[in-house]
Amino acid sequence: MCTLEKRGDLFLLTLTGEDEHRFHPDTIASVLSLLEQAKSQSTKGSVLITTGHGKFFSNGFDLAWAQSAGHGAIKRMHQMVKSFKPVLAALLDLPMPTIAALNGHAAASGLMFALSHDYVFMRKDRGVLYMSEVDIGLPVPDYFSALVVAKVGSGIARRELLLSGKKLKGEEAVALGIVDSAAHDSAEGVVEATVSLGESLAAKKWNGEVYATIRKSLYPELCRMVDLTANNLATHNL
């Protein structure tokens, strides 16, 4: 399902297996638990890198699980939307820089998971970003929209992401300012690039709590939507 490995100052969270890494309630709980573990073990210089195995980074919520409930499908969808919110809140509140290394496709809530990181790297050779909701007739959760507004600066890019049903490849996603890099020819290459960035960030030995507070202050509306508050900076270090 997912694992957390510590390599010096770096935490590597991996969505394991060759499946689509759909966010089922059990997967959501597992990811949240590992983020809490990384937070509890963090020190000055800690950095989180998140990646996956196989063709998909994550293909979104487990729609098949929801639909298997028949008349209870809507209730299950609401359950996943509600339980996923703390995952994004945990990433925004994590006292360290965060980097998403997209090994493959990132769609719907899988893309929102990626964009909740401070940096997003894609592969050049494969993988797309895709917000499928407009194509399949599902409304976008309000906190997803708040995340896109917070993290994607251009109105054109937001339109392409949410209103076009377009599958964006790496170079186009970089050009639109959605991801930071897409110059990597393999899953290993994108992880290596994020490890290099992670090590350079770790060397700065920043105070993680201060880092998280500044991050939250950048996105006040998003933090409100995911039930976080941007606490004032502690003054004892000033």
UniProtKB/Swiss-Prot annotation:
The record marks 133 as: Important for catalytic activity. Its main location: cytoplasm. Pfam families: ECH_1. GO terms for cellular component: cytosol; nucleus. Keywords: Cytoplasm, Fatty acid metabolism, Isomerase, Lipid metabolism, Nucleus. Gene3D superfamilies: 2-enoyl-CoA Hydratase, Chain A, domain 1. Pathway: Lipid metabolism; fatty acid beta-oxidation. It is an enzyme of class 5 (isomerase). It is found in: Cytoplasm; Nucleus. It catalyses: a (3Z)-enoyl-CoA = a 4-saturated (2E)-enoyl-CoA; a (3E)-enoyl-CoA = a 4-saturated (2E)-enoyl-CoA. Its EC number is 5.3.3.8. GO terms for biological process: fatty acid beta-oxidation; fatty acid catabolic process. The keyword Ribonucleoprotein does not apply. GO terms for molecular function: delta(3)-delta(2)-enoyl-CoA isomerase activity. Belongs to the enoyl-CoA hydratase/isomerase family. Able to isomerize both 3-cis and 3-trans double bonds into the 2-trans form in a range of enoyl-CoA species. Essential for the beta oxidation of unsaturated fatty acids. This is Enoyl-CoA delta isomerase 3. It comes from Arabidopsis thaliana (Mouse-ear cress). The lineage of its organism: Eukaryota, Viridiplantae, Streptophyta, Embryophyta, Tracheophyta.
